[in-house]
A protein has these predicted regions:
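Domain-level detector of nuclease and nuclease-like folds
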Residues: 55-162
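C-terminal motif of bacterial Sec signal peptides marking the signal peptidase cleavage site
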Residues: 17-21
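Bacterial signal peptide processing site
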Residues: 23-26
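N-terminal module-boundary/linker segments of secreted carbohydrate-active enzymes
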Residues: 28-72
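Bacterial N-terminal signal peptides that target proteins for export
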Residues: 1-11
Length: 162
């Protein structure tokens, strides 16, 4: 009887936890310009082009003035929108320091094949804005996503801006 009660309690708590995350409203300012059904199946590449690979920025953001904005964390501690117009004035002048003080939502410290499986990933790369241990700019991502998916694009932008 005790074993059944413990199992039922665990199942009920799991269901409550699942439903509380599913019932969160979308982050404010979230705009979707494509449908998830339009995203093709994984082809072996770490990224996919959306919207015909055409940017769609509001007219007021088409400026040479640098800026960066970060959403506040939601009630579950998740990052929201990070948005910047990167200029040389935002780029760091010092080396990146440790970001281990930030524990992004979903963080698990695990190794696979001698490498850490998960990385603290900057939404806007450190080399672009110099934001180091900003919890509003760090998410949990796989090493593959960070190194193969995000870093090549960060490097392209940094090379262009320099």
């Amino acid at each position: 009887m005790n074993r059944t009660r413990i199992s039922l309690t665990a199942a009920l708590l799991s269901l409550c936890l699942l439903l509380s995350g599913c019932m969160m409203p979308p982050a404010e300012g979230t705009v979707t310009s494509f449908s998830l059904e339009d995203i093709p199946a994984w082809s072996g590449e770490p990224y996919v082009a959306v919207d015909g690979n055409q940017p769609d920025f509001p007219e007021e953001d088409m400026t040479s003035v640098s800026f960066e904005t970060y959403s506040e964390l939601d009630t579950l501690g998740r990052c929201g929108v990070a948005y910047a117009n990167v200029g040389q004035d935002l780029m760091p002048t010092e080396d990146r320091e440790s970001i281990s003080s930030v524990t992004p939502s979903g963080w698990i410290n695990r190794e696979y094949d001698g490498e850490y499986l998960y990385n603290r990933c900057h939404l806007i790369g450190f080399q672009l804005t110099g934001e180091n241990a900003n919890e509003e700019n760090l998410i949990t991502g796989t090493r593959y996503m960070n190194v193969d998916g995000m870093l090549p694009f960060e490097n392209l932008v940094a090379d262009y801006v320099k």
